[in-house]
Amino acid sequence: MADVSMRQMLEAGVHFGHQTRFWDPKMRPYIFGERNKIHIINLEKTLPLYKDALNFAGRLASNGGKILFVGTKRPARELVREHAARCGMPYVDHRWLGGMMTNFRTVKHSIARLKDLETQAEDGTFDKVTKREALALSREREKLDRSLSGIKNMERLPDAMFVVDVGYEHIAISEAKKLGIPVIGVVDTNCSPREVDYVIPGNDDAIRAIELYVSGIADAVIEAKQASSHAAAAGKDDFVEINDTAS
């Protein structure tokens, strides 16, 4: 697992919360104090909780579990897309469509339509229709791709959800809770941690802080997958060796 230090969190600005007048009292246990009317998050609480989240993500990944990365606000989009793709996990980086999880069966039809349009674009079908029809198909494809490209290879509901800003993504979290999907969430001082299973108290606006969270989860997933793969290969070698001895 990637070794993250308190110094790295400080340098990334993880400890900076929101203005004190916007705070959520449920975040009181994670707040160190205030400075210039800004709440300061207690990194002595954040660091072990972040490591708990990394361990959970790693355990899931080692067993073949899928974690859906969710970050649709502007500072998070590119980082979520980059690191989710890097570790082979699905993601939502544009806009959370209502019912994306609770009505997943219908969403799968839209994914099938997207894949069909991609095939048509590649095999020359668009060239065989009128310019107006081709333009309409291209626009439909772009719209679906913008919303669904990160989950188009997700065959089933995820085993967990990782959310960068729990306030901004409250609809996604609500759907996850209805379905019993565990949530890993970055929770700033203006949000409630109540619906989050693995709370990461921290700044959810600074790009460096967001990158620390997202890259750390991705690294934990990659390391767990590699360890699982190596263990499986070692077990296979042992099995072959036993057979050879027996013969």
UniProtKB/Swiss-Prot annotation:
This is Small ribosomal subunit protein uS2. It comes from Halorhodospira halophila (strain DSM 244 / SL1). It comes from the Bacteria. Disulfide bonds: none annotated. GO terms for molecular function: structural constituent of ribosome. One of its GO terms (biological process) is translation. It holds the Pfam family Ribosomal_S2. One of its GO terms (cellular component) is cytosolic small ribosomal subunit. Keywords: Ribonucleoprotein, Ribosomal protein. Gene3D superfamilies: Glucose-6-phosphate isomerase like protein, domain 1, Helix hairpin bin. Belongs to the universal ribosomal protein uS2 family.
